[in-house]
């Protein structure tokens, strides 16, 4: 299952192919 949201907080799931995602929160 890939990320469908362009802005996500889940760095463990890769984004869907063709979409550019950015982490809107930094855990580390």
Curated annotation (Swiss-Prot):
Disulfide bonds join 2-16, 9-21, 15-25. The keyword NAD does not apply. When conjugated with a fluorophore, could be used as a tracer in surgery to discriminate nerves from their surrounding tissues, particularly during tumor resections or after traumatic injuries. The dye is conjugated to Lys-4 residue and this synthetic peptide shows only a small decrease in ability to inhibit Nav1.7/SCN9A compared to native peptide. The keyword Iron does not apply. It is found in: Secreted. The modification Asparagine amide is found at residue 28. Its main location: secreted. Belongs to the neurotoxin 30 (phrixotoxin) family. The presence of a 'disulfide through disulfide knot' structurally defines this protein as a knottin. This is Mu-theraphotoxin-Hsp1a. It comes from Homoeomma sp. (Peruvian tarantula). The lineage of its organism: Eukaryota, Metazoa, Ecdysozoa, Arthropoda, Chelicerata.
